[in-house]
Curated annotation (Swiss-Prot):
One of its GO terms (biological process) is RNA processing. GO terms for molecular function: 3'-5'-RNA exonuclease activity; magnesium ion binding; polyribonucleotide nucleotidyltransferase activity; RNA binding. GO terms for cellular component: cytosol. Keywords: Cytoplasm, Magnesium, Metal-binding, Nucleotidyltransferase, RNA-binding, Transferase. Belongs to the polyribonucleotide nucleotidyltransferase family. InterPro entries: ExoRNase_PH_dom1, ExoRNase_PH_dom2, ExoRNase_PH_dom2_sf, KH_dom, KH_dom_type_1, KH_dom_type_1_sf, NA-bd_OB-fold, PNPase. PANTHER family: POLYRIBONUCLEOTIDE NUCLEOTIDYLTRANSFERASE, POLYRIBONUCLEOTIDE NUCLEOTIDYLTRANSFERASE 1, MITOCHONDRIAL. Residues 622-690 form the S1 motif domain. Involved in mRNA degradation. Catalyzes the phosphorolysis of single-stranded polyribonucleotides processively in the 3'- to 5'-direction. This is Polyribonucleotide nucleotidyltransferase. The lineage of its organism: Bacteria, Pseudomonadati, Pseudomonadota, Gammaproteobacteria, Enterobacterales. The gene is pnp.
């Protein structure tokens, strides 16, 4: 008999249910979490033993959406789900980031978390539900895990914070922020904002953390009722004697190595020191474990760098805590791209391009929450050469997708609306060098490339990565962190924004005890750094260029009566296809009658506009048009009068005298003036040649000629 154990509670405006004991009983733990008809089934499986020689923590998080959750069948050829979408990859990372720091440092057993969306309410995004499910399943499993965590989405509507806003509410919100953390500490923040102040962003983080306590309380209650016994796992005791011997041999030498400012030279020296120390110790005692020595060397290395920062000494590259590396900013570096920039900050460099396209180039995204079109794309590429390595080159990895989305969030708030700038815009950031904060370099480069392309962004934006070193009550916030400072520090804190406020904030915190005061210091220090970078960027380009590139398509907009759309499209698209072939343009028609014409040549666009005006022009009775004979029949001739319209000249209307044979007067392709004498209810046009040639007839309308 299956007996579910259920916790149900109110979470803001939503009801959350966590259920365990019914499904996947062979998994280490499994829960079904639902929030107002959005349900995610989350399982956790942990291996009891680590693999021999395992040197890192093999945690895998897979978030997957099933189309049956929305009552749909996949549209792919095989009619089943395939590789993870970009949205699924981002949500997998969102779950991974706050749970990874909560496993013990020396825990190396393989753990897999799988979150499957099995029901979806279009108003409730499954990501928060999946985060709650991962927290609950890990807490129930007995695996060494210092949770649970809570998770909340925070909106900002009418100057008020909103807990877990619906999809419709988010459209009105100036903020979309996800925060996750334990009862006492924030661990992860992911957000995009419409240029909010530092205080407003910090307030949102604190609000979300306070509100999610109800989640943690209910997970703890569920664990008390249904949790599995804690694993009998203990960290291996530290070999203090060996640690002391390693520190004696390596600490001073590593300290000297970490005064080398050039990254590759420093890495070479550090690797040589580690190899020397390992070789020396093994020569003294061949029973020692080389892997253990390497682990201790890593710990000594971390202590050397951190203690120097906490003592107020210069950082690895000689900077003070709030100094920014040297900047080099250039625009228009690629001759044929629509916009380009090369942004260099120390040993981090991004080559960024902006490309303008038409509405047809927009990305159609079929998500579980519904279909949408995205006309602003930002892609981030991180080739192995950027860090002096070799490696696989191919489709983007999780990290590249995540960094690209963060950079996009940093720029999105300043992009013009489609009515202001009716282009699809694609930005690509090629990381050509990397030593910390390449995603924020991408934000800076994107802003520069967009302005170089003539995109009327509302303001320039820049990004900066902050770090933290904390021991007890002593802490130091670092501006513009290097890769080593990110790896050896306690926090990775990325902020993007304009002079007026923040557009994106991402935090990943590895320790507990990060207070509001520390976050306030970091945000204020980041603001100073951001303004400094913007000042340098503005020396290269301060406003968007007045015109787009000569190589970019120019989009001209016109409006027609929606009832005339069918005339422009024609039967089976025949008219619009002929128009695009004739004029060499791209033509897009919207349901409200808005027509967008894209062309690299202004004359071609004008020709297309003129032809559309002809097609949609109202036929005026008693008006004379320049026509062309298209068909000859026994009872008269059909004459095209422009705009794809055709009328009949009856045999009696060809001449003032009797006409026995139409071909005596007219030939195919002959141009003749005709007068419109009637348009009947069915839109059929009656024409007359004889009335058009009377002495008092007006001249034919030249604009109607083919």
């Amino acid at each position: 008999m299956l007996t579910p154990i259920i916790r149900k509670f109110q979470y803001g405006q939503h009801t959350v249910t966590i259920e365990t004991g019914m499904m996947a009983r062979q998994a280490t733990a499994a829960v079904m979490v639902s929030m107002d008809d959005t349900a995610v089934f989350v399982t956790v499986v942990g291996q009891k033993k680590a693999k021999p020689g395992q040197s890192f923590f093999p945690l895998t998080v897979n978030y997957q959406e099933r189309t049956y959750a929305a009552g749909r069948i996949p549209g792919s050829f095989f009619r089943r789900e395939g590789r993870p979408s970009e949205g699924e990859t981002l949500t997998s990372r969102l779950i991974d980031r706050p749970i990874r720091p909560l496993f013990p440092d020396s825990f190396l057993n393989e753990v897999q978390v799988i979150a499957t969306v099995v029901s979806v309410n279009p108003q409730i995004n499954p990501d928060i539900v999946a985060l709650i499910g991962a927290s609950a399943a890990l807490s129930l499993s007995g695996i060494p895990f210092n949770g649970p965590i809570g998770a909340a989405r925070v909106g900002f509507i009418n100057d008020q914070y909103v807990l877990n806003p619906t999809t419709d509410e988010l459209k009105e919100s100036r903020l979309d922020l996800v925060v996750a953390g334990t009862a006492g500490a924030v661990l992860m923040v992911e957000s995009e904002a419409d240029i909010l102040s530092e205080d407003q962003m910090l307030g949102a983080v604190v609000f979300g953390h306070e509100q999610q306590q109800v989640v943690i309380e209910n997970i703890n209650a569920l664990v008390a009722e249904a949790g599995k016994p804690k694993w009998d796992w203990h960290a291996e005791p530290v070999n203090e004697a060996l640690h002391a011997r390693v520190a004696e041999l390596a600490a001073a030498r590593l300290g000297d190595a970490y005064r080398i400012t050039e990254k590759q030279e420093r890495y070479t020296q550090v690797d040589a020191i580690k190899a020397d120390v390992t070789e020396a110790l093994l020569a003294q005692d061949d029973t020692l474990d080389a892997a253990e020595i390497q682990d201790i060397l890593g710990s000594v290395e971390k202590d050397v760098v951190r203690s120097r920062v906490l003592r107020g000494e210069p950082r690895i590259d000689g900077r003070e805590k709030d100094m920014i590396r040297g900047l080099d900013v250039r625009t228009g570096v690629l001759p044929r791209t629509h916009g380009s920039a090369l942004f260099t900050r120390g040993e981090t460099q991004a080559l960024v391009t902006a490309t303008l396209g038409t509405a047809r180039d927009a990305q159609n995204i079929d998500e579980l929450m519904g279909e949408r079109t995205d006309s602003f794309l930002l892609h981030y590429n991180f080739p192995p050469y950027s860090v002096g390595e070799t490696g696989m080159v191919g489709s983007p990895k999780r990290r590249e997708i995540g960094h690209g989305r963060l950079a996009k969030r940093g720029v999105l708030a300043v992009m013009p609306s489609p009515s202001e700038f009716p282009y699809t815009v694609r930005v690509v950031s090629e990381i050509t060098e990397s030593n910390g904060s390449s995603s924020m370099a991408s934000v800076c480069g994107a802003s520069l490339a967009l302005m170089d392309a003539g995109v009327p962004i509302k303001a320039a934006v820049a990004g900066i990565a902050m770090g933290l070193v904390k021991e007890d009550e002593n802490f130091v916030v670092l501006s513009d962190i290097l890769g080593d400072e990110d790896h050896l520090g306690d926090m990775d804190f990325k902020v993007a924004g304009s002079r007026d406020g923040i557009t994106a904030l991402q935090m990943d915190i590895k320790i507990e005890g990060i207070t509001r005061e520390i976050m306030q210091v970091a945000l204020n220090q980041a603001k100073g750094a951001r303004l400094h970078i913007l000042g340098v960027m503005e020396q290269a380009i301060s406003t968007p260029r007045g015109d787009i590139s000569e190589f970019a398509p120019r989009i001209y907009t016109m409006k027609i009566n929606p009832e005339k759309i069918k005339d422009v499209i024609g039967k089976g698209g025949s008219v619009i296809r002929a128009l695009t072939d004739e004029t060499g343009t791209t033509i897009d028609i919207e349901a409200d009658g808005t027509i967008k014409i894209a062309a690299t040549d202004g004359d071609k666009a004008k020709h297309a506009i003129r032809r559309i005006e002809e097609i949609t022009a109202e036929i005026e009775v008693n008006r004379i048009y320049a026509g062309k004979v298209t068909r000859i029949v026994d009872f008269g001739a059909f004459v095209a009068i422009g705009g794809g319209k055709e009328g009949l000249v009856h045999i009696s209307q060809i001449a003032d005298k009797r006409v026995d044979k139409v071909t005596d007067y007219l030939q195919m392709g002959q141009e003749v003036p005709v007068k419109v004498i009637e348009v009947d209810r069915q839109g059929r046009i009656r024409l007359s040649m004889k009335e058009a040639t009377t002495p008092d007839a007006e001249a034919p309308a030249p604009e109607a000629a083919e």
